[in-house]
């Protein structure tokens, strides 16, 4: 066999979404005899470790376009419940950003974070990045420390929204709208942490009416600022 080059391990990544029993009663089930002290199912942890998944995206999926990350951090008993519009359910925020970061450590994987560019935007993405990656001494990094997470998560890979070409997506954008929003969000985020890698949304499927023009149009705006 001739070796051409090394395959980027991130090709074999995956994602988890607050959908059905994927999170609640799936990977997270406090009180179950199979769960650890943090409420995570040990049998699920063992199976995911066996898969050797190098990177896992959070929090989805269509879910991200209605995700308010601030609701998912801090004392669990103080977190609000919200109507979850993507899958028409109730999100109680019993597990959130910091818990998922802990879970990815347990399964020997890396966390990829998606930002909400559907119903939110640039400021929210920057605040989230500051919370996750900045060491301390600022509003949101100090908030993370207050929440019991002293060291930054140092999340390397960030997704700029999810399936923004799809009319099913909350905050669906035209290719021109998304290209400009992704460009400005990327520029701002890299001012906070130049080391991050950014992923823009491509076409959701080959049969989308905007494929492949979506790619060429959005890249006219984002090419100099995104990595994937």
Each language-model region and where it sits:
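Short, well-ordered coil/turn segments that N-cap beta-strands
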Residues: 8-12, 52-54, 107-111, 151-158, ...
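Short, acidic/polar
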Residues: 35-48, 96, 211-228
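Noncatalytic carbohydrate-binding groove/subsite architecture in carbohydrate-active enzymes
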Residues: 174-228
């Amino acid at each position: 066999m001739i070796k051409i080059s090394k395959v980027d391990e991130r090709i074999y990544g995956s994602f988890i979404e607050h959908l059905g029993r994927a999170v609640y009663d799936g990977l997270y089930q406090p009180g179950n005899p199979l769960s650890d002290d943090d409420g995570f199912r040990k049998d699920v942890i063992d199976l995911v470790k066996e898969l050797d998944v190098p990177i896992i995206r959070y929090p989805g999926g269509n879910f991200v376009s209605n995700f308010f990350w601030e609701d998912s951090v801090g004392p669990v008993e103080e977190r609000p419940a919200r109507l979850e519009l993507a899958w028409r359910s109730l999100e109680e925020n019993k597990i959130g950003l910091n818990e998922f970061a802990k879970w990815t450590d347990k399964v020997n994987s890396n966390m990829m974070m998606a930002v909400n560019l559907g119903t939110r935007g640039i400021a929210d993405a920057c605040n989230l990045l500051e919370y996750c990656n900045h060491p301390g001494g600022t509003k949101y990094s100090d908030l993370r420390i207050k929440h019991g997470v002293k060291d930054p998560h140092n999340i390397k890979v960030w997704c700029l929204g999810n399936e923004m070409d799809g009319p099913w997506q909350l905050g669906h954008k035209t290719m021109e709208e998304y290209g400009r929003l992704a460009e400005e969000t990327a520029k701002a985020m890299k001012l906070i942490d130049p080391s991050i890698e950014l992923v823009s949304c491509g076409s959701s499927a080959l049969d989308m009416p905007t494929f492949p023009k979506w790619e060429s149009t959005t890249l006219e705006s984002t090419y100099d600022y995104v990595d994937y």
